Swiss-Prot record:
Interacts (via zinc-finger domains) with CEBPA (via bZIP domain); the interaction inhibits the transcription factor activity of CEBPA and is required to repress adipogenesis. Residues 18-29, 39-49 have a biased composition (Basic and acidic residues). It holds the Pfam family zf-C2H2_6. Residues 15-101 are annotated as: Disordered. A zinc finger (C2H2-type) spans 119-141, 147-169, 175-198, 214-237. One of its GO terms (biological process) is negative regulation of transforming growth factor beta receptor signaling pathway. Zinc-finger transcription repressor factor. Plays a critical role in maintaining the identity of epithelial lineages by suppressing epithelial-to mesenchymal transition (EMT) mainly through the repression of ZEB1, an EMT inducer. Positively regulates neuronal differentiation. Suppresses cell cycling and terminal differentiation of keratinocytes by directly repressing MYC and NOTCH1. Important for the correct development of primordial germ cells in embryos. Plays dual functions in thermogenesis and adipogenesis to maintain energy balance. Expressed in testis, ovary, heart and skeletal muscle. Expressed in the cornea, but absent from the corneal endothelium. GO terms for cellular component: nucleus. It is linked to Corneal dystrophy, posterior polymorphous, 1: A rare corneal disorder characterized by small aggregates of apparent vesicles bordered by a gray haze at the level of Descemet membrane, an altered corneal endothelial cell structure, and an unusual proliferation of endothelial cells. Symptoms can range from very aggressive to asymptomatic and non-progressive, even within the same family. This is Transcription factor Ovo-like 2.
Length: 275
């Protein structure tokens, strides 16, 4: 097989770099971890007390196996790892030199839930503080999708997920960027765009509720209140299913506002006719 197709595997182990290979002008540009620098420049207390005897012992151990390797480069980091029985010196450092370990990004938990988590899922073990949150989570394990998309037939367990998906078909993007006029289907996408692209930091606290935006799913109209949305849908889309889902109390309240507004308009028109 030609050498072009041969792939050389890199060793996963951490290789110890010899400082003797670098010239003096390049040693200043080499990165040295802080923890390793302390071990290199601050020898243990027992080494300080010996004084010149440490150098003599280093030369005498050159004949022993491994002695020449340790005395060849005083600045070379040791590849030994601390044993469980190693003791700490007075300055808090281990008596034996150790290889610097990279900080892991994996978070380890004790496996115990707090007292606030009282409702847990029997299928996956996830915990929730409220029963309604658990009920909503259980829908994701249900194989039957109750809410279907009328455009492509894809099923969802939640109406919110269905609404978010339908906007990809209708092209309704109610959340617009004030800087570049780019529009998004979700508020979180707009906030992420402002932070990453324009560097705009949001002025709300963690988990603080934002001002809700009421969106007409038929034409993309946005209103600050549900009443404004109801008035718009009632006038522009009388046959919309949104009117059927609206509560009777809100419908009666808004219907009274509609009649009062209609009466005001008729009274103004009558006054204009009299003039």
């Amino acid at each position: 097989m030609p050498k072009v197709f041969l792939v050389k595997r890199r060793s996963l182990g951490v290789s110890v770099r010899s400082w003797d290979e670098l010239p003096d002008e390049k040693r200043a540009d080499t990165y040295i971890p802080v923890g390793l620098g302390r071990l290199l420049h601050d020898p243990p207390e027992d080494c300080r007390s010996d004084g010149g005897s440490s150098s003599g012992s280093g030369s005498s151990s050159a004949g022993e196996p491994g002695g020449a390797e340790s005395s060849s480069s005083p600045h070379a980091p040791e590849s030994e790892t601390p044993e469980p029985g190693d003791a700490e010196g007075p300055d808090g450092h281990l008596a034996t030199k150790q290889r610097p370990v990279a900080r892991s990004k994996i978070k380890f938990t004790t496996g115990t839930c707090s007292d606030s988590v009282v409702h847990s899922c029997d299928l996956c073990g996830k915990g929730f503080r409220l029963q309604r949150m658990l009920n909503r989570h259980l829908k994701c394990h249900n194989q039957v999708k109750r809410h279907l998309c009328t455009f492509c037939g894809k099923g969802f367990n939640d109406t919110f997920d269905l609404k978010r998906h339908v906007r990809t078909h209708t092209g309704i993007r109610p959340y617009k960027c004030n800087v570049c006029n780019k529009a998004f289907t979700q508020r979180c996408s707009l906030e992420s765009h402002l932070k990453k692209i324009h560097g705009v930091q949001q002025q709300y606290a963690y988990k603080q509720r934002r001002d809700k935006l009421y969106v007409c799913e038929d034409c993309g109209y946005t209103g600050p209140t549900q009443e404004d949305l109801y008035l718009h849908v009632n006038s522009a889309h009388p046959g919309s299913s949104f009117l059927k889902k609206t509560s009777k109390k809100l419908a009666a309240l808004l219907q009274g506002k509609l009649t009062s507004a209609h009466q005001e308009n008729t009274s103004l028109s009558e006054e204009e006719e009299r003039k």
